[in-house]
Amino acid sequence: MPDTARDRLADARVYLCTDARRRQGDLAEFLDAALAGGVDIVQLRDKGMEAAEELEHLQVFADACRRHGKLLAVNDRADVAHAVDSDVLHLGQGDLPVPAARAILGADVLIGRSTHAEAEAEAAAVQEGVDYFCTGPCWPTPTKPGRHAPGLDLVRHTAALGTDRPWFAIGGIDLGNLDEVLEAGARRVVVVRAITEADDPKAAAEEFAKRLRHA
């Protein structure tokens, strides 16, 4: 098994973003199922949550990731990432600049970027301090209402860059359209509803992991 966070990132195929499941009340059980099924990285994305509440939920994420040897990602906030000792900080285009985040977190925390256009993907593929990036949305998604979906053309462009830096396709990806994403050249994906809304999250994660690792 890969033994460092950077090794685990290189080996990662399935990146899950989920809310804190306050409505369902099953966060710990859900995370155990998804991580056991094959999710490699998990990120809490629950906009509007106060920092204290976010830290409380992230402790559940951190405990689950330790149990399963998987990576914990924090969205947007370097201070929160530092407080919970996360493995990963993910930054959008409008978030904290990468050098500032790196100054706060040091060299060991992995930093990812969101990209939504060819120029952004090209920059993220070479920018100093960036460890991985996400490219999309492949399809419109309710988790990002109003955001233009550049579609699979952006995935194809990113694949054509030939970068050794890990990158993930994102946006509306499910088991029904995964083959299209693979055909466009992606070998890693970010998943939300296809696992969070699955009747059997572990089985859904297993299927994603199997198909991505055999691609």
From Swiss-Prot:
<dbReference type="GO" id="GO:0009229">
    <property type="term" value="P:thiamine diphosphate biosynthetic process"/>
</dbReference>
<dbReference type="InterPro" id="IPR013785">
    <property type="entry name" value="Aldolase_TIM"/>
</dbReference>
<keyword id="KW-0784">Thiamine biosynthesis</keyword>
<feature type="binding site">
    <location>
        <position position="75"/>
    </location>
    <ligand>
        <name>4-amino-2-methyl-5-(diphosphooxymethyl)pyrimidine</name>
    </ligand>
</feature>
<feature type="binding site">
    <location>
        <position position="172"/>
    </location>
    <ligand>
        <name>2-[(2R,5Z)-2-carboxy-4-methylthiazol-5(2H)-ylidene]ethyl phosphate</name>
    </ligand>
</feature>
<comment type="pathway">
    <text>Cofactor biosynthesis; thiamine diphosphate biosynthesis; thiamine phosphate from 4-amino-2-methyl-5-diphosphomethylpyrimidine and 4-methyl-5-(2-phosphoethyl)-thiazole: step 1/1.</text>
</comment>
<comment type="similarity">
    <text>Belongs to the thiamine-phosphate synthase family.</text>
</comment>
<keyword id="KW-0460">Magnesium</keyword>
<comment type="function">
    <text>Condenses 4-methyl-5-(beta-hydroxyethyl)thiazole monophosphate (THZ-P) and 2-methyl-4-amino-5-hydroxymethyl pyrimidine pyrophosphate (HMP-PP) to form thiamine monophosphate (TMP).</text>
</comment>
<dbReference type="GO" id="GO:0000287">
    <property type="term" value="F:magnesium ion binding"/>
</dbReference>
<dbReference type="GO" id="GO:0004789">
    <property type="term" value="F:thiamine-phosphate diphosphorylase activity"/>
</dbReference>
<feature type="binding site">
    <location>
        <begin position="43"/>
        <end position="47"/>
    </location>
    <ligand>
        <name>4-amino-2-methyl-5-(diphosphooxymethyl)pyrimidine</name>
    </ligand>
</feature>
<feature type="binding site">
    <location>
        <position position="95"/>
    </location>
    <ligand>
        <name>Mg(2+)</name>
    </ligand>
</feature>
<feature type="binding site">
    <location>
        <position position="114"/>
    </location>
    <ligand>
        <name>4-amino-2-methyl-5-(diphosphooxymethyl)pyrimidine</name>
    </ligand>
</feature>
<dbReference type="InterPro" id="IPR034291">
    <property type="entry name" value="TMP_synthase"/>
</dbReference>
<keyword id="KW-0479">Metal-binding</keyword>
<dbReference type="InterPro" id="IPR022998">
    <property type="entry name" value="ThiamineP_synth_TenI"/>
</dbReference>
<dbReference type="GO" id="GO:0005737">
    <property type="term" value="C:cytoplasm"/>
</dbReference>
<feature type="binding site">
    <location>
        <begin position="141"/>
        <end position="143"/>
    </location>
    <ligand>
        <name>2-[(2R,5Z)-2-carboxy-4-methylthiazol-5(2H)-ylidene]ethyl phosphate</name>
    </ligand>
</feature>
<feature type="binding site">
    <location>
        <position position="144"/>
    </location>
    <ligand>
        <name>4-amino-2-methyl-5-(diphosphooxymethyl)pyrimidine</name>
    </ligand>
</feature>
<dbReference type="InterPro" id="IPR036206">
    <property type="entry name" value="ThiamineP_synth_sf"/>
</dbReference>
<feature type="binding site">
    <location>
        <position position="76"/>
    </location>
    <ligand>
        <name>Mg(2+)</name>
    </ligand>
</feature>
<dbReference type="Pfam" id="PF02581">
    <property type="entry name" value="TMP-TENI"/>
</dbReference>
<dbReference type="GO" id="GO:0009228">
    <property type="term" value="P:thiamine biosynthetic process"/>
</dbReference>
<protein>
    <recommendedName>
        <fullName>Thiamine-phosphate synthase</fullName>
        <ecNumber>2.5.1.3</ecNumber>
    </recommendedName>
</protein>
<keyword id="KW-0808">Transferase</keyword>
